Amino acid sequence: MLWIDKYKPTSLDKMDYHNDISINLKNMIKSGDFPHLLVYGPSGAGKKTRILAVLQEIYGPNALKLKIDHRTFKHPTSSKNIQITTISSHYHIEINPGEAGSYDRVVIQTIIKEIAQSPPIDSGSLGAFKIVILNEVDKLSKDAQHALRRTMEKYATFCRLILCCDSTAKVIDPIKSRCLGIRVPAPSQEEIEKVLAKVATAEKFDLPSKLAVNVAKQSGGNLRYALMLLESQKAKQYPFQSTELPLLDWENYISQIVKDCFEEQSPARLSIVRGKLYELLGHCIPPELIFKTLLLEIFKKLDHNMKFEIIHWASYYEHRSQIGSKPIFHLEAFIAKFMSVYKKYNQ
């Protein structure tokens, strides 16, 4: 079992940081007034861990007895079959509607209707409703979000929604106004170091403080990434020979792309870079992460006077990538713009 699963807290009392959030959630549950929730924050901050702890607080340990199903839904007006993966207990169901693509509206309406029509039998007055957890709600189509707003009003008596996303910027206002927003910030570097030390003690190995600092720094506030990085380092070399951390394969690949861009600015070089960007996307590296890592790598070699313009174009094309459906077009456009600006600046 991976450390991120083995040492994941299962109750609000066992959380390692953001105790104020845990206290507020416990008080809200005890009051008996449990609204729809919109839980948001950066990746690896602990959003899902807290959501599962909320389920345990409401329903007890049976809420954590999970099963994975592969569900098939039929489109009401066509013969199209829609397949998604669900994680559920007797008290809740968790789905990522984005798996359904443009049919996300159908999946949301069907799931919520099913759940609302079968309230839990043995939950008592504290949880006389079932919970639907929707992941990556910010990536839902506008049509699906409006359908979600109507559905959450209709079935509010026997169903509560917990919406989870990294940012609320793309969530429509009618949904935000019907949910209690809970922001889960990224843990600080010191908090990540404490968790790493705690895991090292439980696993009975010596963790050099310098290595813990480097892992926490490289994680960028992502505790999940920090734990996986430490676990991989221990598997590769223990006792630790060095406290330095090698780059991941995809990070090395992006470093090579940036090197290519600085060496030559031409259509031929752009074509080579495009192929490498395709490789990254083909290996499921998120386009947002590619944009961010590209920019950070470019900044390491860039003159201060150019940084503001490059930031502008990176944010411009990243925004267009969010709106569009073909990230490769916008990644390539950003690289082309960078080559143009860099070549013009050095003439």
UniProtKB/Swiss-Prot annotation:
A GO molecular-function annotation: DNA clamp loader activity
Top-rank taxon: Eukaryota
GO biological process, one term: DNA-templated DNA replication
Database matches in InterPro entries: AAA+_ATPase (IPR003593), DNA_pol3_clamp-load_cplx_C (IPR008921), DNA_Rep/Repair_Clamp_Loader (IPR050238), P-loop_NTPase (IPR027417)
PANTHER family: REPLICATION FACTOR C / DNA POLYMERASE III GAMMA-TAU SUBUNIT (PTHR11669), REPLICATION FACTOR C SUBUNIT 3 (PTHR11669:SF1)
Family: Belongs to the activator 1 small subunits family.
Protein name in the entry: Probable replication factor C subunit 3
Subcellular location: Nucleus
CDD domains cross-referenced by the UniProt entry: AAA
Subunit structure, interactors included: Heteropentamer of various rfc subunits that forms a complex (RFC) with PCNA in the presence of ATP.
Task of the protein: The elongation of primed DNA templates by DNA polymerase delta and epsilon requires the action of the accessory proteins PCNA and activator 1.
Gene encoding the protein: rfc3
